[in-house]
Amino acid sequence: MSLSTLSHPAAAAAGSGKSLFPAGPAAQSVHFPKARLPVPAAVSAATAAVHAEDRVSSLTQVSGVLGSQWGDEGKGKLVDVLAPRFDIVARCQGGANAGHTIYNSEGKKFALHLVPSGILHEGTLCVVGNGAVIHVPGFFGEIDGLESNGVRCGGRILVSDRAHLLFDLHQAVDGLREAELENSFIGTTKRGIGPCYSSKVTRNGLRVCDLRHMDTFGDKLDILFKDAASRFQGFQYSKSLLKEEVERYKKFADRLEPFIADTVHVLNESIKQKKKILVEGGQATMLDIDFGTYPFVTSSSPSAGGICTGLGIAPRAIGDLIGVVKAYTSRVGSGPFPTELFGEEGDRLRKAGMEFGTTTGRPRRCGWLDIVALKHSCQINGFSSLNLTKLDVLSGLSEIKVGVSYTQTDGQKLQSFPGDLDTLEQVQVNYEVLPGWQSDISSVRRYDELPQAARLYVERIEELVGVPVHYIGVGPGRDALIYK
């Protein structure tokens, strides 16, 4: 894969007050604002608070927060910020492969994997929908960790009776399959997600409701064990192992029972009662089983369609969808990454952004923002707005590149994000170069107080994808957010 760089008028025109972008169907003119007198800190904070309240209160009854890249965009933080204004926060797909890092009001860090990010807010009901897969030991491990830190979970979490159970055997199979593929690693988290969804699709999986029928639970689990043993030589299976697992799940069944509910009914009744629901997506659109960089994808649908199938609510009930996009791009594991940076440039973003997986701890691959991939995500999901995260990480760069288009080896420009990986691996990325900024922006809370070049960057993204940026992250804390 090669790249080319387009000279951009922004570098020369910054601060001139003139339009920085050519007029045309894909872009509107952007002008830098005239110089302003300093605003007293108290007035600035009050104005920012009012703007934030207006922005959040205007969200629709059922809203969603979805990842628009390859995950790790910072979805959990936005869900945590928005959750107090919603009655319910719901997860619709995925499992413990999703890692959401959030901070409470005291700055304490919580790494969540299956429990929805709304759990830190006492008045919020958290729902794990039918589209998710549940590793019960891991689920209780999360709950125990939260409660040991003073977060009450009892009576605040509902788990769908239709959700599929993820067993340790699925995790074992995940590792065996990855080893079998040798050099063609997909980059699985080895949490058993893919094998569990495989069991679901082949219709021999067990669901949460099966825990209510322990008289037949062992026979159903035996089928899963035998299937794994017949497929993988390295999988150890015995009747004694099956018996141990059944006894273990008898105890889990008793503890899980208070959490189990028909969440499809609960959510639809809540919609009738005008309660507000915030949907928290796991992973991201570029990892979608249908629309991502297949086969280097997850096993569920982290795009807008997964909300309906993963929660059992009608498409017409869904209103605002917020796409979360990092100010640059990262991905964990294998797979195409057209704008990836190598060497010192990639290391600089990785260190500044602390780009190490919440779930795996693996260093993330880093690169420039890919507008082609972002437009693909916006098209599929119909985002009403974007949350641009980690803008502060770009501080200190003399220039910032944005991948705006792909060119094929024959010189033809691609009109869309290709589904063919061979094509994607060979594209040439065409970049625009924008001026960077040197100041630390982590304490900025008003959009008009950002450096001129930072505002240019935000507005150019809006122009290129045709979706407004309403939220801008400038640090990890829940207060490090600008409402635009």
UniProtKB/Swiss-Prot annotation:
BP-aspect Gene Ontology terms: 'de novo' AMP biosynthetic process; IMP metabolic process
Function text: Plays an important role in the de novo pathway and in the salvage pathway of purine nucleotide biosynthesis. Catalyzes the first committed step in the biosynthesis of AMP from IMP.
Positions that bind GTP: 71-77, 99-101, 364, 390-392, 473-475
Organism: Zea mays
Gene Ontology cellular component annotations, sorted alphabetically: chloroplast; cytoplasm
Compartment list: Plastid, Chloroplast
Origin organism lineage: Eukaryota, Viridiplantae, Streptophyta, Embryophyta, Tracheophyta
Cofactor(s) this protein requires: Mg(2+)
Record: active site: 72 (proton acceptor), 100 (proton donor)
Residues the entry annotates as binding substrate: 358-364
Catalyzed reactions: IMP + L-aspartate + GTP = N(6)-(1,2-dicarboxyethyl)-AMP + GDP + phosphate + 2 H(+)
Sorted UniProt keywords: Chloroplast, GTP-binding, Ligase, Magnesium, Metal-binding, Nucleotide-binding, Plastid, Purine biosynthesis, Transit peptide
Enzyme Commission code: 6.3.4.4
Molecular function as annotated in GO: adenylosuccinate synthase activity; GTP binding; magnesium ion binding
Record text on subunit structure and interactions: Homodimer.
A Pfam cross-reference name: Adenylsucc_synt
Similarity comment text for this entry: Belongs to the adenylosuccinate synthetase family.
InterPro entries assigned to the protein according to its UniProt record, in alphabetical order: Adenylosuccin_syn_GTP-bd (IPR018220), Adenylosuccin_syn_Lys_AS (IPR033128), Adenylosuccinate_synth_dom1 (IPR042109), Adenylosuccinate_synth_dom2 (IPR042110), Adenylosuccinate_synth_dom3 (IPR042111), Adenylosuccinate_synthetase (IPR001114), P-loop_NTPase (IPR027417)
Chief location bin: plastid
Pathway: Purine metabolism; AMP biosynthesis via de novo pathway; AMP from IMP: step 1/2
Protein name per Swiss-Prot or TrEMBL: Adenylosuccinate synthetase, chloroplastic
